């Protein structure tokens, strides 16, 4: 008899556990199965979003892979929230909390059912960090599988995507397109299954997962509706058995060096600002000492190479065609930007995996060369100053303005700010501020894609700065600063900003400040009262437990310092 690979399901051995086994027999387990490791297949399948509509089929393929490796697969589901569908509505308040709900629910099932390993399948934005947090907390050998990117839509021979529709709303308001043109974009932007197609949050976090080594090589850029994606999930199911045999756990993979690799890849690809929030949260679960300042440290050294949307020309499917994320990682590793000695779910190191990976195709245009990058350093920067002492996040790729000073136009809700833009009350040079939308204040730190896209659609993407203690979608571009912390709800300086105060954003100095004296800030602070927190349900629990964005907006910080 071979080595017993069961880590936790040994708990079902013996006469005292006959009742437990009786219930497992009812779902199909046999005497032989009780000798094998039990592997959970966590799926975020749902019909509420195109990102996840195909995941049930992928879960069944993962189940097949687990069974093929002579282990016992047990499929279970968790929730998903569509950022794109909830955007601009009250539903967006539930988006970030869903990350932690996903993580908690997967960890709960793995723990409660005494599972020995895990294949976690996610697609939409919060699925991916939710799955990674669960993997880190559950602690059993695990592989993450990305559901894959959507294909681009097409109108009149031009590729479009979901952000084209958001920006179309602004173009429509400005009179640049009519009702029929907007409808044409709406009806053709999303042609099938898969996550939003640019280097937005889902594709960013999938790429980060591959760079971390917690997903299989090549899997982050394989499209949702492809044979390669089907192969990814079946191979992931088979890989778990190998991890069990070699005794490789998430803690062996999710190291400080691995997170530095992930940040490097995100910077090179021009990823979403949400990557900072999510990688901080995943590192917290993995008990890795990663801080918001690590992002600036790496940002200064890593060039932005990918000409991907939202600031570039191409989408993830185009990157797949020229070699995918593995080819980009190979290029980065060959030029000394990655730690090659990090362990991965293949049982090999990053360097060993990349030695077998193909290089980028010749004459491709998606990834720019080191001697002519899109930007000489990374596009995600952390700003600090008297408006955000513990850090704010900006994405500066494609933004020509390096310094902007203007009068604050202050709003306490996204709805009010949006209406002001549509009513042409926001002028060039203004600094549009949306506050009380942070993790606690929102609650849920909603994304401001609708607002930023309307500004871009109206031609004001670089003439009006947008600041918030909320978040931005990975599809956002323009002169935007989010994650301002401490947030207004916590009494951060943004709460004391008043209409007309002059605000300066300086990306070169990495500073964000208001031209208000310390004495005046203290005077305003003395008159300020915190609004009441949300009281009930999911959002109430979230508001009372979540930390600030500069710590990843996690809900289990507890007594850790």
Swiss-Prot record:
Keyword Magnesium on entry? yes
Active-site residues are: 473
> How, per the record, is the cofactor bound?
Binds 1 [2Fe-2S] cluster per subunit. This cluster acts as a Lewis acid cofactor.
Question: What positions are modified (N6-carboxylysine)?
Answer: 126
Entry keyword set: 2Fe-2S, Amino-acid biosynthesis, Branched-chain amino acid biosynthesis, Iron, Iron-sulfur, Lyase, Magnesium, Metal-binding
- Binding positions for [2Fe-2S] cluster? 51, 124, 196
GO MF terms held by the record: 2 iron, 2 sulfur cluster binding; dihydroxy-acid dehydratase activity; magnesium ion binding
- Listed cofactors: [2Fe-2S] cluster; Mg(2+)
- Spell out the Pfam families in the cross-references: ILV_EDD_C, ILVD_EDD_N
Query: What are its E.C. numbers?
Result: 4.2.1.9
Query: Which GO BP annotation is one of this protein's?
Result: L-valine biosynthetic process
Q: Which domain of life is it from?
A: Bacteria
> Quick one: which pathway?
Amino-acid biosynthesis; L-isoleucine biosynthesis; L-isoleucine from 2-oxobutanoate: step 3/4; Amino-acid biosynthesis; L-valine biosynthesis; L-valine from pyruvate: step 3/4
Which residues does Mg(2+) bind? 83, 125-126, 447
Q: Which reaction does it catalyse?
A: (2R)-2,3-dihydroxy-3-methylbutanoate = 3-methyl-2-oxobutanoate + H2O; (2R,3R)-2,3-dihydroxy-3-methylpentanoate = (S)-3-methyl-2-oxopentanoate + H2O
What job does this protein perform?
A: Functions in the biosynthesis of branched-chain amino acids. Catalyzes the dehydration of (2R,3R)-2,3-dihydroxy-3-methylpentanoate (2,3-dihydroxy-3-methylvalerate) into 2-oxo-3-methylpentanoate (2-oxo-3-methylvalerate) and of (2R)-2,3-dihydroxy-3-methylbutanoate (2,3-dihydroxyisovalerate) into 2-oxo-3-methylbutanoate (2-oxoisovalerate), the penultimate precursor to L-isoleucine and L-valine, respectively.
Q: What's the family?
A: Belongs to the IlvD/Edd family.
* Summary of subunit composition and partner proteins: Homodimer.
In Swiss-Prot or TrEMBL terms, this protein is called Dihydroxy-acid dehydratase
Instruction: Tell me the name of the encoding gene.
Output: ilvD
């Amino acid at each position: 008899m071979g080595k017993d690979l069961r880590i936790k399901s040994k708990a079902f051995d013996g006469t005292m556990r006959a009742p437990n086994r009786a219930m497992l027999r009812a779902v199909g387990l046999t005497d032989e199965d009780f000798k094998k490791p039990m592997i959970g297949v966590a799926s975020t399948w749902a019909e509420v979003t195109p990102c996840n509509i195909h995941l049930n089929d992928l879960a069944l393929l993962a189940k097949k892979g687990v069974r093929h490796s002579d282990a016992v697969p047990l499929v279970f589901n968790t929730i998903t929230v569509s950022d794109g569908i909830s955007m601009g509505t009250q539903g967006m308040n539930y988006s970030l909390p869903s990350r932690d709900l996903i993580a908690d629910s997967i960890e709960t099932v793995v723990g409660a059912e005494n599972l020995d390993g895990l294949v976690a399948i996610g697609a939409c934005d919060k699925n991916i960090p939710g799955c990674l947090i669960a993997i880190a907390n559950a602690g059993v050998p695990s592989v993450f599988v990305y559901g894959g990117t959507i294909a681009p839509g097409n109108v009149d021979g031009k590729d479009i995507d979901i952000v084209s529709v958001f920006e179309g709303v602004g173009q429509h308001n400005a009179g640049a397109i009519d009702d029929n043109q907007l409808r044409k974009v709406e009806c053709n932007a999303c042609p099938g299954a898969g996550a939003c197609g640019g280097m937005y949050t889902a594709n960013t976090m999938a790429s980060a997962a591959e760079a971390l080594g917690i997903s299989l090589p090549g899997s982050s850029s394989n499209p949702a509706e492809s044979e390669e994606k089907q192969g990814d999930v079946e191979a992931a199911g088979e890989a778990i058995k190998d991890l069990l045999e070699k005794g490789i756990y998430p803690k062996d993979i999710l190291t400080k060096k691995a997170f530095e690799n992930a940040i490097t890849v995100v910077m090179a690809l021009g990823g979403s600002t949400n990557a900072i929030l999510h990688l901080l949260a995943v590192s917290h679960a993995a008990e890795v000492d990663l801080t918001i300042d690590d992002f600036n440290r790496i940002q200064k050294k890593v060039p932005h190479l990918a000409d991907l949307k939202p600031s570039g020309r191409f989408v993830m499917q185009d990157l797949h065609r020229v070699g995918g994320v593995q080819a980009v990682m190979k290029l980065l590793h060959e030029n000394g930007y990655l730690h090659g000695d990090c362990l991965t779910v293949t049982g090999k190191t990053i360097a060993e995996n990349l030695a077998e990976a193909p290089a980028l195709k010749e004459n491709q245009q998606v990834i720019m060369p080191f001697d002519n990058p899109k930007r000489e350093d990374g596009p995600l920067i952390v700003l600090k100053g008297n408006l955000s002492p513990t850090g704010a996040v900006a994405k500066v790729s494609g933004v020509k303005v390096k310094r902007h000073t203007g009068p604050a136009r202050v709003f306490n809700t996204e709805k009010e700010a949006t209406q002001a833009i549509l009513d042409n009350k926001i002028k060039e040079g203004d600094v549009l501020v949306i506050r009380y939308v942070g993790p606690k204040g929102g609650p849920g730190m909603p994304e401001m894609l609708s607002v930023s896209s309307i500004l871009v659609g109206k031609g004001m993407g670089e003439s009006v700065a947008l600041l918030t203690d909320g978040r931005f979608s990975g599809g956002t571009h323009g002169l935007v600063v989010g994650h301002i912390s401490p947030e207004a709800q916590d009494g951060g300086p943004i709460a004391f900003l008043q209409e007309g105060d002059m605000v300066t954003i300086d990306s070169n100095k990495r500073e964000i400040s208001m031209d208000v004296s310390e004495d005046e800030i203290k005077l305003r602070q003395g008159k300020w009262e915190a609004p009441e927190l949300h009281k009930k349900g999911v959002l109430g629990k979230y508001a009372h437990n979540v930390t600030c964005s500069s710590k990843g907006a996690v809900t289990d910080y507890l007594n850790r310092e």
